[in-house]
Amino acid sequence: MSVGCPEPEPLHSLPCCGPGAAPVPGAGVPLLTEDMQALTLRTLAASDVTKHYELVRELGKGTYGKVDLVAYKGTGTKMALKFVNKSKTKLKNFLREVSITNSLSSSPFIIKVFDVVFETEECYVFAQEYAPAGDLFDIIPPQVGLPEDTVKRCVQQLGLALDFMHSRQLVHRDIKPENVLLFDRECRRVKLADFGMTRRVGCRVKRVSGTIPYTAPEVCQAGRADGFAVDTGVDVWAFGVLIFCVLTGNFPWEAASGADAFFEEFVRWQRGRLPGLPSQWRRFTEPALRMFQRLLALEPERRGPAKEVFRFLKHELTSELRRRPSHRARKPPGDRLPGPLRLEAPGPLKRTVLTESGSGSRPSPPSVGPVVPVPVPVPVPVPEAGLAPPAPPGRTDGRADKSKGQVVLATAIEICV
């Protein structure tokens, strides 16, 4: 069976909106990756691509590929075309990502894909919705964080996205603000994206190359030879770190390992061996601290499900200290761990990607959001009634408020001390 038939069909049969076919959103019907690997992609020359798709602008570019905002000339439908370099990925991994994304597209909190799947001489290509407001990382004011009402709207929708994934025994494995796409800058509508590292629960994978602050401690400690079995707990941990970041504009640590003094201090607090709170956690209320204790439990089996955050969102999460930007030099006396690591925070962290060692898999290139598919409009998800009042008008970081695609260079988020 060939991907790229001329008539539009639901994505579960994997056609491609090639010449003459109007793009339609995927039907959200799962197709086993094993079945997809038997398919052959339709090959399009560069002239075929420009014949049917008008380039609006480039949205992002990275090691693994690029993302272009295009308009389908037949209908004017805008979409994000993701070009993945063949030299950086295997066909089965590309098809796995498309299949998984489509199988989850029935959730209003997960990015949708169009029935556009093809290859060029150098790239594999698929199309997804376009998110005009970029990603969550882009709007977090460093060392300040987002307004709590905005955070609660975002967390509510991400919790529903993760609960939907986990109920289907799928683990995202790369939860971070860069993979949360926005349709407005007040987070009234957000969607989870980038499923290049997603695997089924219980699947054994090799250790990822490198770590980022969202990586769970059991993943950091996994041996390169043995790897580890995928579990929803890694998403729950990353979700907890993400919530800390959006509330504070800082990372809690650089890596969840014993070599990181900030993480070690957190471990001592979690185990009841530290009198008082670590300085960077003092801004949170008691309900928020209980939430973090559950999401960031050191043992994976003790972490609550992602949807457990909902019961904490009815409470205030931060105290008045939340409104004060953190400064490295302002550390309470006697609140440091011994040694030089506690005296200076690491440098600013920029956008990071993870890959699986020796597996040939890769994360998605910079992802960009979805648009209203044709002819069926995408329904706007509405957070739970009464959860969060409307956000105050305007941006909170002093920059001009203008919708745009994802930015490749990151706004720095620093360690809070």
UniProtKB/Swiss-Prot annotation:
Residues annotated for ATP binding in this entry? 59-67, 82
Segments forming domain Protein kinase: 53-318
What protein name applies here?
Serine/threonine-protein kinase SBK1
Tell me the tissue specificity.
Answer: Mainly expressed in brain, with small amounts in heart, liver, kidney and heart.
Q: Quote the catalytic activity from the record.
A: L-seryl-[protein] + ATP = O-phospho-L-seryl-[protein] + ADP + H(+); L-threonyl-[protein] + ATP = O-phospho-L-threonyl-[protein] + ADP + H(+)
Q: What does this protein do?
A: May be involved in signal-transduction pathways related to the control of brain development.
Give the highest taxon in the source lineage. Answer: Eukaryota
Question: Which organism was this protein described from?
Answer: Rattus norvegicus
